Amino acid sequence: SPGERVVTIETAAELRLQHGHVVRLETRPPSIEGTGELGVRDLMINSLRMRPDRIIVGEVRGAEALDLLQAMNAGRDGSMGTIHANSPADALARLEVMALSAGMGLSSRPVREQIAAAIDLVIHIVRLRDGSRRVVHVSEVTGMEGDTIMVSDLFDWYQTHVDSEGFAQGVFRPTGIVPRAIHRIEDIGIYQPP
């Protein structure tokens, strides 16, 4: 909504959000003397003092993953970040490893529980051989089963052919799984056709 405060955290400011209340934070390298560095984790912690409604981290690469998960589990719905991974499940596994690197002495189980509670959707984008980028999976995190974070693909992209100019063509199709969060989706005005 227009009144929401969105805080973006990036190594190099690239996001150009069309929103009225955006606070843009950018990392800073250390000075020649080796002081004054502001990393993503520093900015993540400082952003929480700004009373954000949503936090967007340009790229989650390390211990800031734990801070982002905690923020997401404390009412900052719609927060997001990017992670380089080979699949939605791999992205969640990488997020776990990064959160564990925060040095808080946590074991895997509570971190996985935080991930399962915080993350609703994983959007997987790949770069194809032709250089184009495609969303190939929209997956929902459905909770935990034992020690495993459960993920269900809601949509996937299937390559049908390569056109005469060498570009991959395909179809983005629903898998038939109705999202568990369908009521929350409808509450914000997005309806699934019957």
List each language-model region with its residue ranges.
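Conserved, well-ordered active-site substructure
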Residues: 1, 24-25
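Post-Walker A helix-loop "phosphate-sensing" segment adjacent to the P-loop in P-loop NTPases
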Residues: 1-7
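Conserved P-loop NTPase nucleotide-binding/switch module
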Residues: 9-23, 47-146
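Conserved inter-motif catalytic segment of the P-loop NTP-binding fold
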Residues: 26-33, 114
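A generic structural signal for short
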Residues: 32, 56-57, 170
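Short glycine-rich substrate-engagement loop in P-loop NTPases that contacts/grips substrate
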Residues: 33-41
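Histidine/acidic residue-rich metal-binding segments in metalloenzymes
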Residues: 44
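NTP-binding/hydrolysis catalytic cores, primarily Walker-type P-loop NTPases
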Residues: 131-194
